[in-house]
Design a protein with these regions (language model features):
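A short, exposed loop/beta-hairpin motif centered on an aromatic-Gly-Thr core
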Residues: 48-53
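Conserved NAD+-utilizing ADP-ribose enzyme module
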Residues: 1-24, 46-47, 62-63, 67-167
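Short, well-ordered alpha-helical microsegments
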Residues: 36, 61-62
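Short aromatic-glycine-(Arg/Gly/Cys) micro-motifs in beta-strand/loop hairpins
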Residues: 19-46
Length: 167
């Protein structure tokens, strides 16, 4: 896997913002060819809710495309590139760490489904293979938030950017 320390990823994003650059290059991996974003194809119970998910890492998007292709054994592996123009009119939520707020946010979206927030864009860590066991133990009530955060502390995770504004 092509994983970075999440703080490295966020530092990269913050540097771009600090430089006054209002654009970010994002990638989306899929096994389906498309010309328009169709959120009816989005899965319901995802980390940041129903949305269109991208990443700043092209290799991560390529891995997403490969997993989808292997899971469905249909289509091809596609990696789409987008330019995201940040705007002050967008309500953007940044998660900077695998912390209690991130855990609770993911729990609400995964358990309740749909969109459990009012943000247009959410940026933060992915609950993936490295973190899923701890996240599941927290969601089931076996671990307290503080225990889960301590276990997640040393994990390296990928990033995700979820857009809900197409809904």
């Amino acid at each position: 896997l092509h994983q970075l320390d999440f703080s490295e990823t966020l530092n990269y994003i913050e540097e771009i913002i600090a430089e006054g650059t209002s654009t970010l290059i994002l990638y989306h991996g899929s096994n389906i060819a498309f010309d328009r974003i169709d959120l009816s194809k989005s899965h319901n119970r995802r980390d940041f809710g129903r949305g269109f998910y991208c990443t700043i890492l092209e290799k991560q998007a390529s891995e997403w495309a490969h997993r989808l292709y292997m899971r469905n054994l249909s289509g091809k592996e596609y990696v789409y590139q987008y330019v995201f123009h940040q705007s002050e009119s967008l309500k953007i939520k940044h998660f900077y760490a695998l912390d209690a707020e991130w855990l609770e946010f993911i729990k609400n979206n995964r358990i309740k489904g749909g969109i459990q927030h009012s943000y247009d864009v959410v940026i933060g860590p992915v609950a993936d293979d490295n973190t899923m066991e701890t996240v599941q133990l927290y969601m089931s009530g076996i671990l307290k938030s503080s225990e889960a955060v301590e276990r997640l502390r040393y994990n390296k995770v990928n990033n995700q950017v979820s857009f809900q504004l197409f809904l």
